[in-house]
Amino acid sequence: HSTSRRQRQMCIETGYNIILKKPINIGIAVSLNDGNLIVPVIHDADKLNLSGLASQIDTLAAKARENKLAPDSIQGGTFTITNFGTFKSLFGTPIINQPQVAILAVGYIEKKPAVVETPEGDTIAIRHKMYLSLSYDHRIVDGALAGAFLRSIADELENWNA
């Protein structure tokens, strides 16, 4: 996972200390029916495969919308992901979920023309594209680290093998 290779994004800032968290606990922003937002946490997310993550997201989102989350289900997050794409937004600027130091926003996936390199030369083809947006606390995560983190996520998504 990109998150396990880029541990500094998994810190929390407590005012006087920066704590590097070993477990990767991913918060997922869930929009509630009343217009509010809550961030349940997938604990030890780095130990789950894609199917396990999807199952946890479905379970936590359903519990959140039914107002049945246990208190520990919304605590201990080390990094949050929000999906503006749910609302067909291409991108947005996410606000860091304190005391975490970074949050990733995923935009709407849409078909776009793209230049594709082939043995015969460049050609235009239709590809699925989306924007990623990372907000981070620059006191802890610098631009080089943030850029490398986004690049590693893009590389994994672009070379996905299901």
What are these regions (language model features)?
Residues 1-162:
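C-terminal catalytic/motor cores of large multi-domain enzyme assemblies
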